[in-house]
């Protein structure tokens, strides 16, 4: 049996360290204008995920794409968002079956590789009565083609408010690398990109 610590009403969110708070403030200021890209460099284990979550908050992002290199990081990232009191709809796009992991089931994290299912979900993000207020999509670099297919699925899928690329050094280099499609605004549509 797996025990997962989920957000509880009244539980305080993590307080960023001063360097994290400064990074969030600077990144939000930089990324405020649609069409911008930003680079955040920090050592392993220094809280880059928390900074990214708080940047999304600071931008008021309702539709977020968070791209990671591995299945373990996909699960870890989903749980980090939940621990930071993010209760919005959340889906992992990869070969990971969230239904087969007790921690992800308890955290109410879905998974799919079906562009039409994801497109249906993404198309109802908004403030209307029949809409969901926010959606976080966590995707592995290997599954980026599913995001591209979703955005071309025929649903009225808006661009992501923010796309975050974890371990971005993996997408550097030649533009024709499979994972580099996340840099191409014609293939993966996002108003802002954070590397």
Residue ranges: model-predicted function:
Residues 54, 58-98, 141-143:
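Conserved Walker A/P-loop ATP-binding site and its immediately adjacent core
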Residues 142-143, 153-195:
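SF2 helicase catalytic motif II
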Residues 119-159:
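Conserved helix/coil segment N-terminal to the catalytic DExD/H
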Residues 2-41:
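Conserved pre-motif I regulatory segment
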Residues 92-121, 140-146, 170-171:
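Conserved helicase motor
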Residues 33-39, 61-62, 134-135:
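Pre-Walker A (Motif I) flank of P-loop NTPase domains
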Residues 58-59, 85, 128-131, 154-157, ...:
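Conserved catalytic network of the ASCE P-loop NTPase/AAA+ motor domain
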Residues 33-56:
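Walker A/P-loop
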